[in-house]
UniProtKB/Swiss-Prot annotation:
PROSITE patterns: AA_TRANSFER_CLASS_3. NCBIfam families: hemL, PRK00062.1. One of its GO terms (cellular component) is cytoplasm. Its cofactor is pyridoxal 5'-phosphate. GO terms for molecular function: glutamate-1-semialdehyde 2,1-aminomutase activity; pyridoxal phosphate binding; transaminase activity. Its main location: cytoplasm. The gene is hemL. Gene3D superfamilies: Aspartate Aminotransferase, domain 1 (3.90.1150.10), Type I PLP-dependent aspartate aminotransferase-like (Major domain) (3.40.640.10). This is Glutamate-1-semialdehyde 2,1-aminomutase. It catalyses: (S)-4-amino-5-oxopentanoate = 5-aminolevulinate. Pfam families: Aminotran_3.
């Protein structure tokens, strides 16, 4: 595999974008600040591939940050959307497609008895926090360092030594009063959670977390961690919330809660359930969800919620995922990929640790294990930046940050994995010196 990268047109377009949008992008990670180099401007995507506007083709392991689990522009999804768009792009009224997707989600996800569709994962997490507080009559919430729940003020909290229980805001413009009720703990640390419950008796509405961390790199729950959170929240009259925006329908059809056998009270979803279109959802027990307006007093609304195109793409995507052997294929593909990456790094004398669950994977360039965000920050970010640039030259598109999980799809075949591992071999050989 040889270097293919030429990005003249991307450079021109991105230079113009810098004058039009903050940082030249619509979401910060796309600016390549974590890895350096030239951001890629895409032209089209298909299957496991993405093409930039200079004509370069990449094997894509971002998948639009998770939604493209069937591969980009799956023909059955495209056909369904073409038929749906003839009926209109937005109704702003109930449609039968909402019922169908809701039934599919409820049938699949153990915790969900009722569901509300929104437009993004951030919206879902904002709404679920309001619902947690209303249902319990308590204001405080526990989140984990490195777990991302969208960009709403109450979740933008920096954890760590000395501020673990102070709820200090992690972005300018977020008042301390907004985050004062947000408590934080290290991921995989049950004792820290117990301490927070002990210090805040009858005050914590619930615990929210990514059951597999995907926004601090790829970090899995240690045995007993999720089970322990379930016990602690139940004992303290609090709710357990799984943010499955990333893991939902990706690591199994029923999400992380099915995979690990731990059922939360509420769940947030997104990405996969929209088949590549903007979507989010939150759901849970009927007694809790019945508090959401107009059934109850907890207000939440959205102009484009339940959008017929998003519902259509979501329905077709879930139909494809429900076919026999789907998750076995994803597991096999991703396991082979991450095992090959780790072996390649070790062959070149580069410290690495990583892993995968179904169609989700990640690695850190450091000694392991990595169990939380503090340990993740020992990753050699400079070396990762070099690796990212070398992989781009060889036609492989990884997340432009060491703190983002990677994704495979049903469209990734043995051929793509072979070519990817060849690119890793060459890239590790270059950067080791």
């Amino acid at each position: 595999m040889t270097d293919i990268l030429k990005t003249t047109y991307s450079e021109e377009v991105f230079s113009s974008a810098l004058e039009l949008m903050p940082g030249g992008v619509s979401s910060p990670v796309r600016a390549f600040k974590s890895v350096g180099g030239q951001p890629i401007v895409f032209d089209r995507v298909k299957g496991p591939y993405a093409w930039d506007i200079d004509g370069n083709r990449y094997i894509d392991y971002i998948g639009s940050w998770g939604p493209a689990i069937c591969g980009h522009a799956h023909p059955e999804v495209i056909t369904a959307l073409q038929e749906a768009i003839e009926k209109g792009t937005s109704f702003g009224a109930p449609c039968v497609l909402e019922n169908k997707l809701a039934e599919m989600v409820i049938d699949a996800v153990p915790s969900v008895e009722m569901v509300r569709f929104v437009n993004s994962g951030t919206e879902a997490c904002m709404a679920v926090l309001r619902l947690m507080r209303a249902f319990t009559g308590r204001d405080k919430v526990i989140k984990f360092d490195g777990c991302y729940h969208g960009h709403a003020d109450m979740f933008l909290v920096k954890a760590g030594s000395g501020v673990a229980t102070l709820g200090l805001p992690d972005s300018p413009g977020v008042p301390r009063t907004t985050t004062a009720n947000t408590l934080t703990a290290p991921y995989n640390d049950l004792e820290a959670v117990k301490k927070l419950f002990s210090e805040n008796p009858d005050a914590i509405s619930g615990v929210i977390l990514e059951p597999i961390v995907g926004n601090a790199g790829f970090i899995t729950p240690e045995p007993g961690f999720l089970e322990g959170l379930r016990e602690l929240t139940t004992e303290n009259g609090s709710l357990l919330v799984f943010d499955e925006v990333m893991t939902g329908f990706r690591i199994s059809y029923g999400g992380a809660q099915e995979k690990f056998g731990v059922t939360p009270d509420l769940t947030t979803l997104g990405k996969v359930i929209g088949g590549g279109l903007p979507v989010g959802a939150y759901g849970g027990k009927k007694e809790i969800m019945s508090m959401v307006a107009p059934s109850g007093p907890v207000y939440q609304a959205g102009t484009l919620s339940g959008n017929p195109l998003a519902m259509t793409a979501g329905i077709k995507t879930l139909e494809l995922l429900k076919q026999e052997g789907t998750y076995e294929k994803l597991e096999s593909t991703t396991s082979r990929l991450i095992e090959g990456i780790i072996q390649s790094a070790e062959n070149n004398g580069i410290a690495i640790n990583g892993g995968s669950v179904s169609a989700m994977f990640g690695f850190f360039l450091c000694e392991g294990p990595v169990r939380n965000f503090e340990e993740a920050k020992t990753n050699n970010s400079e070396l990762f930046g070099k690796l990212h640039r070398e992989m781009l030259k060889r036609g492989v598109y990884l997340a432009p940050s060491p703190f983002e999980a990677g994704f495979t799809s049903l469209a990734h075949s043995e051929e793509e994995i072979d070519r990817t591992l060849e690119a890793f071999d060459q890239s590790f050989s270059v950067i080791k010196n």
